C-alpha cells in the first residue's frame, strides 16, 4: 500500500490568530494544487489560532488541514486550563499532537498520559500524532531502537487495531529538536522501520502498511526529500521551518517530489 506523505507543521507557541491567517494563505497559494495530490499538508497551531484557521480553510476551501498541539485526556469538567477533544472536534480539527518531547519534558507527561490523550482524540474522530524519541544519552549508548520501540508501545497502550489505523506516529530524536542537528536519513529509517515492526505486532500487517510514521527534528527544505524518500518514513513533523508560509510550501513541494 502506497502511503501518502504527511507534512505537518508544528507552530509551537508562535504566531497569533492574525498572523496565522497570513501564514496559511501564503502556504496555500504558494503550493500548486497538484502537489496536494502527492502530499497531505497540515498545520498544528496554538489553541487561540484554531478558529481563525478553520474559518479561512473552510471559507476558501483550502487543501490544508489543521489541528492542535495538545489535548486533555478528560472529556469535560473541573480541569482549569484544559481543552477537550470534543471541543477540538467542534472546530473540525483533523489532528492533535500528543506526547511532544517538549510536553514530556516541561510538563512531565508520561507514556500512560500520552496514550490516554491519544485515546481521547480518537474517540472524537481526531487523528493523534503520537510523538516518541530518544535523548542524546540513549542515542550515544546505542540503545535508541529498543528505547523508542518500548516508548511507542507504552504510548499506544489501550488502542485497538482500528484506532491505530487512524493514528500517526512521529519519531523525533530529542537531541535533534531545535538544535540544528539532524538525524541522517539512515538514522530515521532505522528507527521508523522498528516502529513499523511494532505496529505489525500490535495490529497486523495491513494496519502497519497503512500507518504513517513521520520524522521530526530540525526538518528543512534541503533535507526533507532524502528523509521522506526512505521506505518507512512517511513525512515530517516540521517546527521552525513551518512558520513562514512560502518556505513551508517549498518544503512540502520538495517532499512531494519523492512521493
From Swiss-Prot:
Pathway: Carbohydrate biosynthesis; gluconeogenesis; Carbohydrate degradation; glycolysis; D-glyceraldehyde 3-phosphate from glycerone phosphate: step 1/1
The UniProt record lists the keyword Iron: no
The protein, known as: Triosephosphate isomerase
Binding site for substrate: 10-12, 178, 218, 239-240
Gene Ontology molecular function, alphabetical: triose-phosphate isomerase activity
Organism from which the protein derives: Corynebacterium glutamicum (strain ATCC 13032 / DSM 20300 / JCM 1318 / BCRC 11384 / CCUG 27702 / LMG 3730 / NBRC 12168 / NCIMB 10025 / NRRL B-2784 / 534)
Xref: Gene3D superfamilies: Aldolase class I (3.20.20.70)
One BP annotation, GO: glycolytic process
Single GO cellular component term: cytosol
Major localisation: cytoplasm
Subcellular location: Cytoplasm
Similarity remark: Belongs to the triosephosphate isomerase family.
Keywords: Cytoplasm, Gluconeogenesis, Glycolysis, Isomerase
Disulfide pairings: none
Catalysis: reaction(s): D-glyceraldehyde 3-phosphate = dihydroxyacetone phosphate
A Pfam family hit: TIM
The organism's place on the tree of life at top rank: Bacteria
Catalytic residues as annotated in Swiss-Prot or TrEMBL: 100 (electrophile), 172 (proton acceptor)
Assigned EC number: 5.3.1.1
Enzyme class, first EC level, given as a word: isomerase
Keyword Cytoplasm: yes
Subunit structure: Homodimer.
Physiological role: Involved in the gluconeogenesis. Catalyzes stereospecifically the conversion of dihydroxyacetone phosphate (DHAP) to D-glyceraldehyde-3-phosphate (G3P).
